[in-house]
Amino acid sequence: MKTGALTTFLALYLPVTVFATTLRLSNEVDLLVLDGKRVSGSLLRGADSIELENGPHQLVLRVEKNIRLSGNEERLYISPPLVISFDTQQTSQVNFHLPRLENEREASHFNAAPRLMLLDGDAMPIPVKLDILTTTSTAKVVDYEIETERYNKSAKRASLPQFATIMANDSTLLSDASELDAVPPQSQTLTEQRLKHWFRLADPQTRSHFLQWAEKQPSS
């Protein structure tokens, strides 16, 4: 796909007005999966927010925060993976609101009974369904996209079956510009679908940076 064609494609198919909800990111929340798709850490690095369309959404995340130990020591607390489902139909902004997590006792309570709220732009609670994602993988590195698919097929508290179908891995699709240009014809639709998806999630500044980068890439 030539750079000019890529830019035109994004401009035609991805108008800014399609977005209706801004998910404000938090440096104490590690976002793992969004709507059944693994989130690329490199894509979110430095971003303050993600743009979402109106409708149901599902996040898989971990809370990561430094907590106090005895004396003046600290350690990094990492929560179990959590699944949180919600609807943005009437919401223009979504913010994370975490309970107090300052010491080992509070961390243990959170592990046993996680409490995490989402607030709208007026600091009002958004109805959510929250659950712990129990992973079945014994691998050293857990594939949270696969675990989320399994969860969504199991009719659990925060399951959303519409997000159970996994698409292509975005890290392999977007890792190199030549990979975008050399995709076989039969995969072109999937490539465009994946590009559209991740471009939609990026905030306006990230989209602008991507378009500037695309313009500088040599045509094939």
Swiss-Prot record:
Keywords recorded for this protein, A-Z: Signal
UniProt cross-references to Pfam families, sorted A to Z: DUF2057
Signal peptide (from-to): 1-20
Disulphide bridges: none
PANTHER family: UPF0319 PROTEIN YCCT
Record family assignment: Belongs to the UPF0319 family.
Entry protein name: UPF0319 protein YccT
